[in-house]
Amino acid sequence: MMVIRPVERSDVSALMQLASKTGGGLTSLPANEATLSARIERAIKTWQGELPKSEQGYVFVLEDSETGTVAGICAIEVAVGLNDPWYNYRVGTLVHASKELNVYNALPTLFLSNDHTGSSELCTLFLDPDWRKEGNGYLLSKSRFMFMAAFRDKFNDKVVAEMRGVIDEHGYSPFWQSLGKRFFSMDFSRADFLCGTGQKAFIAELMPKHPIYTHFLSQEAQDVIGQVHPQTAPARAVLEKEGFRYRNYIDIFDGGPTLECDIDRVRAIRKSRLVEVAEGQPAQGDFPACLVANENYHHFRVVLARTDPATERLILTAEQLDALKCHAGDRVRLVRLCAEEKTA
């Protein structure tokens, strides 16, 4: 059975394996053992209440409970930009006009922005390609909403998610090649690695501070502004069905879109509810797949189960209860996947 759980120190080798499969561009999952170990340690200290809000971040893994195989990772940053500035570009417009010459030009322009400072961030979502089946992607991505719903007071009112932009299999980014490389004088992969390993001072030192007309970029770079990597398109669709929207903010490195939503308007958070759980044989029928999560902060678990999402008493098997670290009579959080999201 596939189950979401908090990351543990022993997961570092599994995370290294996942990082080696990303193909680049996933800044927060670098193939660097020291960085990943530090990330795990920070997550553990977050759960233990040892860090200020500006440093808090939760990391979860998707595990096969039968074999112990770690198949994916996802994370939440509690409040971005409170220690190091959190940059993106806002895609706006500057108008140049002359009545005398009868000229009017509205020019798309990139403005350096820290507008999302303090927002909670969904990040580090990666599912091993071999496990992209049977609803695992939905479980991995949406499990974070179950955690946020259960422990709402630990998160801020706005949630953002940076989507990976267009990068080819060789690490070539049209947006970086046309813009970032001119200021940073390094390849995309190098900048991505430095950022992912916490060496972010160079961003503030070398970033262009003035607005940039997108018409000055190559056509190839203009075409990928706000577009996602093909492998990231499903993740974007999942978030958009939950209420996230692109509001004209993009990543400073690859031009990928930043999606955002008010936390209390996220579908899975808004519609999830607590029900009592009992042990038994679930009723047969064509029921939809639902997320089921316990309410245990330190031993949080989420699984997928087919059940009636309107039930007041959820029947689960002994195996499902064990995976959730629950007992009969406990209360669990329940919400169905979106109607069009299939798990088979």
Swiss-Prot record:
Keywords recorded for this protein, A-Z: Acyltransferase, Arginine metabolism, Transferase
Gene3D superfamilies tied to this protein: 2.40.40.20, 3.40.630.30
Pathway: Amino-acid degradation; L-arginine degradation via AST pathway; L-glutamate and succinate from L-arginine: step 1/5
UniProt record, GO biological process: arginine catabolic process to glutamate; arginine catabolic process to succinate
GO molecular function annotations of the record: arginine N-succinyltransferase activity
Protein's UniProt keywords contain Transferase: yes
Reported function: Catalyzes the transfer of succinyl-CoA to arginine to produce N(2)-succinylarginine.
PANTHER family: ARGININE N-SUCCINYLTRANSFERASE (PTHR30420:SF1), N-SUCCINYLARGININE DIHYDROLASE (PTHR30420)
Descriptive protein name: Arginine N-succinyltransferase
